[in-house]
Amino acid sequence: MTDLEKHVNRPGRDKQVKKVREKINELGITYIYYQFISVTGRVVGKGIPADHWERTAEKGFQLVYGATANLFLDRHNNYIGYGPEAMELVGIPDPETFCQLPWDKRVGRVFVTCFRNREERNNPGGHLTSDCRGNLRIFMDEFQKKHGLELRVGTEPEMMWLTKNDDGTPTGKGFSKPFCYHIDQFE
């Protein structure tokens, strides 16, 4: 059984998938963002109509591997990490992360775990090594099995000094630019 198949067939996951369907129907959600974190920390993913929830929960969706590196190019204009000839990753939603977006009640979001394509020659359906969130879960599970302890992690919020428009949204202008750690901030 592949890593992907083990993930889809986790005990209790089928019940979680059904609970998400109930929530989708109850809240009137019509569209779902399937999200994962790129190696640079950006939230990337795919949007799919909510009518396809069960199928996507079972089979996943496919997306170009380069999305894990924001489809960035190197200085030679080659995709970072994966070339255009590469197969596509498979994203499998983690139903326990599903929620409705507070700013658009018609839309839900769910985080996914990324896997190698099912048709890959090497390690088909294996965990995708560039899946930051998936790797963290694997490391946490291994740590708990080895040490009998729970690994605790948190976020480090960043700060920028921005001004606001009259409606409260950021203007993108202010004392600093909206690019954390960009060297231009030091000038």
Where are the predicted features?
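Glycine-rich, acidic/polar active-site loops that bind/position phosphate-bearing ligands
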Residues: 1-187
